[in-house]
Amino acid sequence: MIIRKCYINNPNPFFTPPKNNKRRPSFICYAMKRASEIDVARCELNYILQIKNIKIGFPVKRFRRLNEHRACAMRAMVLAMLYHFNISSDLVQASVEQLSDECGLSTLSKAGNKSITRASRLITNFMEPMGFVTCKKTWDKILGNYMPKMITLTPLFFMLFGVSEKKLMDAKKQQLGWINKNLISKGFKPITMIDAKRRSKDTQIKNIFQYRISKHAFYKKKRNAQRLISLDEKEARQTILRALVAKYSITELTKLGPNGLKKQVNISYYYLRKIATNTYPDN
């Protein structure tokens, strides 16, 4: 039997910031510096925390530490998640596919099919059961498919590299204060943490769909959009409204109000019309 010397594509993954490489808040720069100086894959928390089954919440026995390949992937992934972290909402504003690409964890088969298994298994089989992140997968009733996972970083995640929950909360308050100062200077009312989280959720959904689009996903969305747009406009808008009501919480709907909800319906409707007529961007 032939034994492979290496069963992974990239034994030394590292995080490469996206081309736009926007300036990050000082807290994120500080956290990334800490995470690069400390071996997060061999942190004491990885040995003392009890891994849990995400579906039922019961502890699961662990018999060994992270193997070196997964440890290398985790070191890169932690930096990527921090780079895309939204302080106000605790969300990672990037899809698993984008994180995988930027960490060099994605592979391409001879047939041209992309695989992000190494990154997704790291998150699903280790980081989430350990309590470092939480993931939420939402069914998009408008387009008829699953939206990319919404990844939230927990206080335990920051403890991997010695950033306390208090320091995180101070950064969140400072960030919200900066946002409100900017809004007030433009004549708008200040927002709460709930408002900031809702805005971040909307922005993330839009950005992730723009990034992860593939031919298969594109044409599937296009078919669903065409089906919806082919309906009477009033019926199409009612379908979108029901989907939006299901997407937002009661608190978020209260904050939006009738006018805000109507605006979201208009945005979604014209977005679907655009999808229905667009062609796949080959270049």
From Swiss-Prot:
GO BP, sorted A to Z: DNA replication; plasmid maintenance
Classification via Pfam families: IncFII_repA
Keywords carried by this UniProt record: DNA replication, Plasmid, Plasmid copy control
Function: This protein is essential for plasmid replication; it is involved in copy control functions.
Family: Belongs to the IncFII RepA family.
Name the UniProt record assigns to this protein: Probable replication-associated protein repA1
Organism: Buchnera aphidicola subsp. Acyrthosiphon pisum (strain APS)
